[in-house]
């Protein structure tokens, strides 16, 4: 992780040491929140005068406020707009108050970034848009986006990659740069948020010849299901052309219509839910009715929807996300 010396200097101007400035840069860029164990492990120090001075600087500069979470001593929230402005991060929504689950996710993101400091992160929205649109020549319409209605202007604002999960290149100097996406599973038992995330990124995934995806969680309870879901929503669609997808959807839909539920897997049902929107409309309804009645051969569908098959290579990994802490520091904290 290479941090521009300009950013370090901007933070040192507030009275922070170089190490404190580096830590605050990472927090401001990736999370907005941190807990003591993360700073202690980053700085390689224990509780004492050094840490007390750091906390005092944060308070005297009014750069952070503390909030409490179950089983945490305290959570520090970087809230000073002037600090973000100095780093060119004023568009981040880190200054606002957030719900408990959001804070947990931001702390988990920081754990990952601190533990994987050697990769090259696409840190900001501009970095990500520039990489995909300028470097890879992908149109912006394929990027995951969200429209915000401003409180001070009637013009809506279109923002990209609002989830801000870590995205990085392991070797930015390689001839072919392969990007790694990630998703951090929250405390919820459902994988609906993960499915929604994959669907949001599906258009971008289709534009990439190769990419990696990390599914991160504190526990491994959902690993098998997450892998199955990724295979159904990402791997299979990218490995097949539109005709294959359409015929698979027709077969699943026919089984559902005939109440043959036992023949369908969870992956089939997820694929059906995604494909209903993709293959919606009168044309596809006409094709389905004709195919179901054996009036339309598969060869005709393949000739109609032959597409231009581009090979895609996807790499999926489910990984335990451990707290970033010195030995023993994470014990007793809610993660």
Locate each region found by the language model.
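A short, terminal or domain-edge coil/loop segment
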Residues: 31-33, 120-132, 265-283
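A structural signal for short, well-ordered beta-strand segments and their strand-loop junctions
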Residues: 77, 125, 212-215
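C-terminal regulatory/effector modules of DNA-binding transcriptional regulators
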Residues: 170-335
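Non-membrane alpha-helical secondary structure
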Residues: 3, 50, 97, 101-104, ...
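Exposed, interaction-prone assembly regions rather than primary DNA-binding/catalytic cores
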Residues: 99-193
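Basic, Lys/Arg-rich alpha-helical nucleic-acid-recognition elements, primarily the DNA-binding modules
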Residues: 1-85
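Hydrophobic, Leu/Ile/Phe/Ala-enriched alpha-helical segments that form helix-helix packing faces
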Residues: 27, 43, 55-59, 112-120, ...
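Short, amphipathic alpha-helical interaction segments positioned at domain boundaries
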Residues: 80-107
């Amino acid at each position: 992780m290479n941090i521009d010396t300009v950013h370090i200097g901007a933070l040192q101007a507030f009275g922070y040491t170089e190490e404190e400035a580096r830590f605050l840069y990472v927090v401001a860029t990736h999370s907005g929140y941190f807990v003591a164990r993360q700073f202690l492990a980053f700085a390689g120090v224990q509780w004492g005068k050094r840490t007390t001075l750091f906390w005092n600087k944060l308070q005297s500069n009014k750069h952070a406020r503390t909030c409490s979470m179950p089983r945490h001593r305290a959570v520090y929230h970087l809230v000073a707009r002037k600090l973000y402005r100095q780093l060119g991060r004023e568009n981040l929504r880190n200054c606002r108050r957030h719900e408990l689950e959001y804070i947990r996710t931001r702390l988990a993101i920081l754990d990952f970034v601190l533990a994987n400091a050697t990769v090259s992160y696409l840190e900001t929205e501009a970095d990500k848009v520039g990489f995909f649109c300028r470097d890879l020549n992908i149109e912006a319409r394929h990027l995951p986006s969200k429209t915000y209605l401003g409180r001070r202007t009637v013009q809506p604002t279109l923002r990209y990659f609002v989830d801000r999960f870590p995205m990085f290149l392991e070797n930015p100097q390689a001839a072919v740069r392969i990007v790694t996406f990630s998703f951090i599973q929250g405390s919820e038992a459902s994988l609906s948020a993960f499915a929604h995330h994959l669907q949001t990124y599906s258009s971008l995934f289709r534009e990439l010849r190769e990419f990696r995806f990390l599914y991160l969680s504190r526990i491994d309870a959902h690993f098998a299901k997450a892998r199955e879901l990724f295979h159904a929503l990402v791997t299979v669609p990218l490995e097949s052309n539109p005709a294959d997808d359409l015929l698979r959807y027709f077969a699943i839909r026919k089984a559902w219509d005939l109440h043959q539920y036992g023949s369908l897997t969870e992956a089939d049902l997820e694929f059906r839910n995604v494909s209903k929107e993709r293959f919606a409309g009168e044309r596809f309804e006409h094709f389905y009715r004709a195919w179901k009645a054996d009036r339309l051969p598969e060869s005709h569908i393949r000739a109609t929807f032959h597409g231009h098959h581009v090979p895609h290579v996807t790499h999926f990994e489910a990984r335990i996300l451990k707290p970033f802490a010195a030995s023993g520091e994470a014990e007793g904290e809610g993660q």
